[in-house]
Amino acid sequence: MAAAGAGSGRAAVSRSRPPPARFRGCLAGALLGDCLGAVFEGRSVVKLPDLLSFLRGLEPPGGEGEPAGSARRETLSYTDDTAMSRCVVQSLLAKREFDEVDMAKRFAEEYKKEPNRGYGMAVVNVFKKLLSPQCSDVFEPARAQFNGKGSYGNGGAMRVAGIPLTYSDVQDVKKFAKLSAELTHANSLGYNGAILQALAVHLALQGEVSRETFLEQLISHMEDIEADDKSLTDARALGFEDLPFSRRLKKIKEFLELSSVPKEDVLFELGNGIAALRSVPTAIYSFLRCMEADPDIPEHYNNLQRTIIYCISLGGDTNTIATMAGAIAGAYYGEEQVPPSWEQSCEAFQETQKMANSLHELYCQQL
């Protein structure tokens, strides 16, 4: 069990108390991104007219006086992204702190209960080992993956939102994001992606901030995180340059200074794949890009909706990129931008709201 350290200076630092609407927005945004994105997952090309037509189908029939979302209530299923995100949240709420043994057990039991949520084969092997009575170290199965190199996929990042919704101290956010990811992703390119995603949600939760300041803070954190020996060794072993996440954040900064960026450039530089390095920066770029209007997306969609639409339009690992961007945007804009017709079309949306309220209570207790 890993509790937050008293030495982190929590008592000496006055921390803001974000409103519960941001917590509900974060988990709702993540759920929307997963459920909506899953419909288009794996497509190399997602045509925007097809996506917009699908979204119009979520609206209730006009003129019938039905409540929003009633036409397609809970018809969109969530995937392993949300299943594992829920495990993170449920563990934090049950234990009132990060507990690696409890969280690992919940991951494995959730897979055993519902194995058809779209889990990758590699992580299934980890779950099977975690379910074994002989497993004495819950981090060992992940360390053994890929001949001891560990996974650098985006699975740690996609589920991490519960960490910054529990811990207000940025050092705790980094520490427990890393530990939660290491239960399945032992390569630094995997867990550093989870840290980056957690930091993005943490910053978004604090409220209004410029795109420049948001990126500068992320770059500052990641340059420090990626300078350790393991991060440098792992990146070089996989043929990447040093500080790969930091470099992509700087590329995002360049993109945001341009009047327009073709989708092809975004895919080439940032990606739309299952590696954390090829998806977490993409989610962050999507959030920041969609702070402003997009000429290709109808104006009646708000910032949160625009963010999710843009993510899905990139194709590839649509649900994971959209769930990460949705969590960031939801934390930033709050539940006010969560359209009822979208939310109520998603499986377990009411449970998600309840979990968000409980996380807000836990977060405030730790201030």
Swiss-Prot record:
Q: Where does it localize?
A: Nucleus; Cytoplasm; Chromosome; Mitochondrion matrix
Designated name of the protein: ADP-ribosylhydrolase ARH3
Pfam families for this protein:
ADP_ribosyl_GH (PF03747)
Q: How is its activity regulated?
A: The protein undergoes a dramatic conformational switch from closed to open states upon substrate-binding, which enables specific substrate recognition for the 1''-O-linkage. The glutamate flap (Glu-41) blocks substrate entrance to Mg(2+) in the unliganded closed state. In presence of substrate, Glu-41 is ejected from the active site: this closed-to-open transition significantly widens the substrate-binding channel and precisely positions the scissile 1''-O-linkage for cleavage while securing tightly 2'- and 3'-hydroxyls of ADP-ribose.
Keyword Mitochondrion found: yes
Q: GO molecular function of the protein, one example?
A: magnesium ion binding
Gene Ontology terms describing biological process? DNA repair; negative regulation of necroptotic process; peptidyl-serine ADP-deribosylation
User: Catalytic activity annotated for this protein?
Assistant: [(1''->2')-ADP-alpha-D-ribose](n) + H2O = [(1''->2')-ADP-alpha-D-ribose](n-1) + ADP-D-ribose; 1''-O-acetyl-ADP-alpha-D-ribose + H2O = ADP-D-ribose + acetate + H(+); O-(ADP-D-ribosyl)-L-seryl-[protein] + H2O = ADP-D-ribose + L-seryl-[protein]; alpha-NAD(+) + H2O = ADP-D-ribose + nicotinamide + H(+)
